[in-house]
């Protein structure tokens, strides 16, 4: 991402929103129409498992990792710099600092993003678990 802070910021905001949308769809499937009512894999389950590995694991997770690396390289140092200067921080800058730079603010950009990544991962695991296909770490 280099100096493209705005692009990274926008990516994180959009990712959090789209991950939340996708998580709601997964949860709806989990609770309203189980993928494997008998707890055994079926053709739909195999298709969903394929989407999980060929789309989410192969494409989405690497992109999330790229965004995380960019945030670590760009925004974490900015947050540290802002932290050091809190005693002279203008009141007009504080809302931006709280929402966009603070890593420890669960209601801010980074906190919401991390919550959505976690919730989305757990929803995938729960859906696949209905069929005995929950992925396990190697």
Question: Which role does the model predict for each range below?
Answer:
Residues 3-138:
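A cross-kingdom marker for long, charged
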